[in-house]
């Protein structure tokens, strides 16, 4: 990882989503780690520094908001540098996202929307390349 490169952890129980986001974010200039479960994410976070976490709100083993709270206890900056993804439009999901005070993208989303949201979470550092591959 280059010193100026931002490291992003993508957490989703769907391997295809993790793979697609990993490819898109890597092409945008980010260093990407992936986890297919909440437990996997917490295990990675215990060993690795990440700058931004992108997490699905609904993960079978541990809800995304619970992982968020535990992750923020390990890396306090993640309290302000986490992006939620969700296809859940319930009032409960909406309240959870609001209570965490983190941005979210609704599934299905455009990759450029997610990349822009990630870039917005790291204004103080180099952002790699934008969705078109241009320098930020």
Describe these PLM feature segments.
Residues 37, 63-67:
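Acidic catalytic/metal-coordinating carboxylates
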Residues 18, 60:
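The feature encodes the CheY-like receiver
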Residues 46-48, 71-80, 97:
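Conserved phosphotransfer cores of two-component systems
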Residues 19-27:
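Charged docking surfaces used in two-component/phosphorelay signaling
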Residues 56:
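Active-site residues of response regulator receiver
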Residues 1-9, 73-76, 94, 110-136:
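Non-catalytic signal-transmission and effector/linker regions of two-component phosphorelay proteins
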Residues 34-52:
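Acidic, metal-coordinating helix/loop segments flanking the phosphotransfer/catalytic sites
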């Amino acid at each position: 990882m280059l010193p100026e490169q931002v490291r992003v952890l993508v957490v989703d129980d769907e391997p295809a989503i993790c793979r697609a986001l990993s490819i898109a974010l890597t092409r945008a200039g980010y260093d990407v780690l992936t986890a297919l479960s909440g437990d996997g994410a917490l295990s990675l976070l215990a060993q690795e520094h990440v700058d931004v976490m992108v997490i699905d709100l609904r993960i079978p083993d541990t809800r995304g908001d619970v992982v968020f709270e535990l992750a923020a206890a390990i890396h306090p900056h993640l309290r302000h540098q986490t992006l939620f993804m969700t296809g859940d439009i319930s009032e409960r999901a909406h309240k959870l996202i609001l209570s965490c005070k983190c941005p979210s993208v609704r599934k299905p989303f455009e990759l450029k929307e997610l990349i822009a949201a990630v870039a917005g979470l790291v204004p103080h550092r180099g952002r790699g390349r934008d969705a078109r591959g241009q320098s930020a």
